[in-house]
């Protein structure tokens, strides 16, 4: 028997990838990540070393997901990583974050690797501020925070 098979042959059906092993069709499956309706071959890395600002940044200008967050803070006070569901850099203090993560002080940090990515339906944007409030615009110091993401 041949590899691959068609559904509704002759009627414009779809072809599915398979492997013929001893006359039995075993499906071939490609593992891909991404939000519903999107598939790619893996995550894209992103790195940010904080500037002396709120670090308002657009990571991805379309729907996506974050599959890994690694944050490290050398400052003596907590810093706050804020995620926004938008296709451009946030207006910090005006836009409302959808996720706020405290980054522990004094050379501490965290690693978050969810079993399923954190989905953003519009885009992936972020900021890093000195206080937790949604309207906070406290800039962090240069090199306070090192952030790495993996996104799709």
Predicted regions and their residues:
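A generic "folded-domain core" signal
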Residues: 86-89, 134-135, 150-152
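Noncatalytic modules at the cell exterior or secretory-pathway interfaces
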Residues: 67-69, 117-135
């Amino acid at each position: 028997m041949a590899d691959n098979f068609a559904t509704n042959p002759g009627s414009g059906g779809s072809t599915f990838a398979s492997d013929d092993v001893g006359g039995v069709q075993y499906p071939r499956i490609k593992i891909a990540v991404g939000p519903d309706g999107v598939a790619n071959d893996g995550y894209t890395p992103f790195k940010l070393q904080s500037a002396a600002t709120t670090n308002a940044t657009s990571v991805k200008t379309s729907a996506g997901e974050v599959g890994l967050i690694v944050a490290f803070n050398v400052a003596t006070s907590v810093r706050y990583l804020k995620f926004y569901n938008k296709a451009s850099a946030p207006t910090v203090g005006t836009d409302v974050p959808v996720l706020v993560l405290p980054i522990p002080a004094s050379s501490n940090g965290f690693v978050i690797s969810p079993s399923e990515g954190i989905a953003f339906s519009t885009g992936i944007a972020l900021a890093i501020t000195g206080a937790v409030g949604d309207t906070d615009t406290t800039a962090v110091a240069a090199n306070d925070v090192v952030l790495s993401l993996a996104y799709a």
